[in-house]
Amino acid sequence: MTKIIAFAGKKQSGKNTCCSFLHGYQLRSYHLVEDFGLDEEGCLVVDTMMLDASGQAQKTMGALDVTRTDHDFSLWAASNMWPFVKHYSFASALKEICVGLFGLSKDQCYGSDIDKNQLTWFRWSDMPGYKGKKKDKMTAREFMQYVGTDVFRYIHPSIWTDRTLSSISNESPALALISDCRFQNEVEAVQRAGGKVIKLTRGLDSDGHSSETSVDKLKGCDATIDNSKLTIEETNGEIVELMNSWGWLGSVIEKPKEKDPDNLVGGIQKIKE
């Protein structure tokens, strides 16, 4: 049965970093990597083999973007990672709609905070049901927040949880990690599916949209980690201790016999020193 962990918290609370860490921990537990870590941005890095300029295989550490869904990465991940651990997001379907239907760029939907804060051609004054005072152009983040929450969730409150949990049920990874739990119905949906919700306390208070302020009102989370004054390493230690208490982590298979390592096709990029 799939174990589901959802991280709740405001933007920049460390939700994605926690998911990256657990990806590495799970991959090491299944002996799919020997070592892993996080870079300065909280992204997963794992040991791999790459060819040097002379064509010789050299062991190095490379970045593994666990959120990728492109064709080359999916071919590798479908057998090498996703059966054991997979990243999910309640906003995934929304982002697909914003790119495919509304014309936002992939960077605006999936990129950095700078990318998501780029202005779009959509205006507040054109938003259905909007009664605020803003009339100028919306950032990509604002557009996704409004369309995802004030339009789609207004029509069907569980639209994003239904889609995400259905995908998890169909794909059945050993561990499913959800990085963007923000609403009470999302907490309850994860728990009904047998999962657990970990709330992180760190985060910015500058965003007044309900998708951010609702985090303060969440009730019934399975655990809360006050990471406001913790380092990434200390936060990871808290997560390991917590999940071990649930019996949800640890080595699950015997280490296989040594063999020539395969490069993670399309999955790993060499980290520039």
Where are these regions (language model features)?
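Short His-Asn-centered micro-motif
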Residues: 8, 90, 179-181
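Active-site catalytic pocket residues across diverse enzymes, especially alpha/beta-hydrolases
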Residues: 26, 30, 102
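Extreme N-terminal starter segment of soluble prokaryotic enzymes
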Residues: 1-5
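Hydrophobic anchor at the start of a short beta-strand
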Residues: 29, 85, 176, 195-198
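Small-molecule kinase domains that catalyze NTP-dependent phosphoryl transfer to phosphate-bearing small molecules
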Residues: 6-13, 20, 32, 36-39, ...
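ATP-dependent small-molecule kinase phosphotransfer cores
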Residues: 37-174
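Residue-level signature of catalytic and energy-coupling elements of molecular machines
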Residues: 144, 178, 225
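A short, Lys/Arg-enriched amphipathic alpha-helix followed by its capping loop at the start of a domain
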Residues: 18-26
